[in-house]
Amino acid sequence: QDKDIMLAAPTGRAAKRITEATGYKAQTIHRMLELNGGVDIEGGYRFERNAMNPLETDVVIVDEVSMVDIHLLNGLLLAIMPGTHLIFVGDVNQLPSVGPGNVLKDIINSGVFTVCKLSKIFRQEDGSDIVINAHKINKGEHFIMNNKSKEFFYMPRMNTKAVIEELGLLLSKKLPGYVEA
């Protein structure tokens, strides 16, 4: 069907990734809501798009919702017209918001909304050490140490200086293909 769809994410990098993956223009939530630079007394943002000037679209899809705090969510919800479909995409085990709230986790745990949990991992191979250990850590289990792994490293260091030195070595020598300098 012909629906007007808006795509957004909390960060410019995530919005760019959506655009590249879908071929449709995505933008930051702040840009979509037209942030005007102000902040309300309660700590929320001031947006040009709000209850008095809502987004005129059929569907809003927001990715990386685990990074959305309660103030940004409030601004978004105020700008949604009745009848607009709002779809949140995210992983509760990914980065949380810098601001207050654990919005995505709370939405999922509320039991009020329809939730679709995806089980296929696309960024790593199914049997990768990253995937295996991430699942173990999420379950509160000890991760698997494999000294031959090229993906998952555990390097305990006793002080800040040692951590910084090891990080420098990792970025410059062991993982140069993973870092954008």
Question: What role is predicted for each listed range?
Answer:
Residues 2-3, 57, 82-85, 111-116, ...:
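Short glycine-/polar-rich loops that comprise or flank the Walker A/P-loop
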Residues 93-181:
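Conserved helicase motor core of P-loop NTPases
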Residues 63-64, 90:
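Walker B catalytic acidic pair
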Residues 4-58:
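Inter-Walker segment of RecA-like/P-loop motor cores
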